[in-house]
């Protein structure tokens, strides 16, 4: 009986740690972006004494990439979002201490919508820790942040529209001046979902193989590439000599060329089964 009680307590404890209520969580969103727009968010957090230890707790109803001082904090292609049954919002707590650079930290998030509900709960983020004197600090995503529509849009499941002419390579930079950026607003979505802490049990998406096409066939409709096997991932196309504004389609995605010497055309938030 004692063994059963201990096991029951452990299960209950795991459940409490794994899920928490959304009550009190602050959500922000772009004030004017459409439901298909991907969004850049950013904020500089300053302290009087150099920061020594820090964590970020972040959640979104979409998929996202998280950067601290210009560096991607995880090796995954993206993080997020609502689980497949749309009953929980995934939340992550990440130790970002190794990315700290003194008294100022630049946090940047690239958000992409995925929710079928069209929620404007685009980002919830808390940044907290202690400085070199042991003094705690805390900041959260709120109206003091900056936001801007990104250079891509998510038009539907497995479908991204990418416009390289609108890409700003400094969007997550520590040097960017946010002259043409906007302030975000609080979410108007009143529906609450439990937050699922995905940090302890999270199995990240990892790139395991890089495949090259084994055959290609060109006709009047375009070029078909055969990779010789089925795979779960995405296609990256290297373009050379493409003119700015030229448009191409690959799979269900569209791409507007930026006119760079070597361009990489690929979806940032879409992984599909292909051959």
Placement of each model-derived feature along the sequence:
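Extracellular/oxidizing-compartment recognition motifs
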Residues: 21-275
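Bacterial Sec-dependent N-terminal signal peptides
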Residues: 1-22
């Amino acid at each position: 009986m004692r063994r059963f009680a201990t096991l029951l307590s452990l299960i209950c404890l795991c459940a409490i740690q794994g899920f928490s209520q959304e009550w009190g969580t602050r959500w922000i969103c772009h004030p004017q972006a459409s439901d298909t727009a991907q969004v850049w968010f950013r904020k500089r957090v300053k302290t009087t004494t150099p920061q020594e230890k820090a964590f970020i707790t972040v959640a979104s109803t979409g998929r996202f990439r998280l950067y601290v001082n210009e560096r991607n904090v995880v090796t995954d292609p993206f993080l997020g979002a609502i689980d497949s049954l749309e009953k929980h919002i995934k939340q992550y707590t990440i130790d970002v201490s190794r990315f700290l650079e003194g008294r100022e930290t630049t946090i940047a998030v690239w958000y992409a919508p995925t929710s079928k509900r069209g929620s404007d709960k685009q980002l919830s983020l808390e940044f907290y820790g202690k400085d070199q004197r042991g003094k705690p600090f805390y900041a959260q995503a709120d109206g003091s942040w900056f936001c801007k529509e990104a250079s891509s849009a998510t038009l539907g499941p497995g479908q991204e529209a990418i416009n390289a002419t609108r890409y700003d390579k400094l969007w997550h930079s520590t040097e960017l001046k946010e002259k043409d950026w906007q302030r975000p607003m609080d979410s108007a979505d009143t529906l609450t979902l439990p937050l699922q802490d995905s940090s302890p049990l999270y199995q990240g998406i990892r790139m395991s193989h890089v495949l090259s096409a084994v055959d290609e066939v060109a006709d009047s409709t375009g070029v078909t590439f055969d990779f010789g096997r089925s795979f779960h991932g995405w296609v990256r196309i290297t373009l050379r000599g493409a003119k700015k504004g030229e448009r191409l389609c690959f799979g269900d995605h569209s791409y507007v060329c930026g006119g760079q010497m070597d361009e990489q055309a690929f979806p940032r938030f879409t992984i599909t089964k292909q051959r």
